[in-house]
Amino acid sequence: CVLGLAMGTSAAAGYADTNSRITPWISELAFVPIDLSENAAQDEWSGDIGCAVNYFSQQAVSRLIEPSGLKIDPALGKPEKLILVQEAMEAGDDKAAAIYRTIGTYLGYAIPQFARFYDIKHMLLLGRVLTGKGGELIISKAEEVLRDEFPELGKKISLSTPDEKMKRHGQAIAAASLPEI
């Protein structure tokens, strides 16, 4: 049972069951509430608060820049902000690391909620937010939260992201499967 979560422009998901079949369910996790506090982040599109998209995407990175103390021009677009945060992370900036640790903490606490609806043995994490050292930190922090706060799930659910070689193979397979136009 694999739950895939793409953390990029939004938060997209897909699920394969115990028979390795993709279910016919709509696995749209972007608007699933994961933060039930009154001061949860509000989604700019739906107006809802606490939606996963604000915790596992470029929106999360952008929202966490100011509280981290990282100095990035607020007028930049979310993709550009993400690139600058990634560059800061690769350079060893502790403020950038705080952003990724926070996202990893969010993920660690959200996985048990996802597990209420999906039988998860493996979680495949994808998307641009997971690129580089920041992605590694997100995964390690989420694993730490699972291990410390939800030990049974921590033993049952593994987290991973494909390495660059696997990403390239996946892109080649996808390109080869496209129909001729």
Where are these regions (language model features)?
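Short beta-strand scaffold segments in enzyme catalytic cores
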Residues: 4-6, 11-17
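Acidic-enriched catalytic cores of C-N bond-cleaving enzymes acting on peptides and small amides
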Residues: 26-44
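Glycine-rich beta-alpha junction loops
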Residues: 8-11, 33, 129
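ATP-binding/phosphotransfer module of carbohydrate and carboxylate kinases, centering on a glycine-rich
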Residues: 3, 18, 38-181
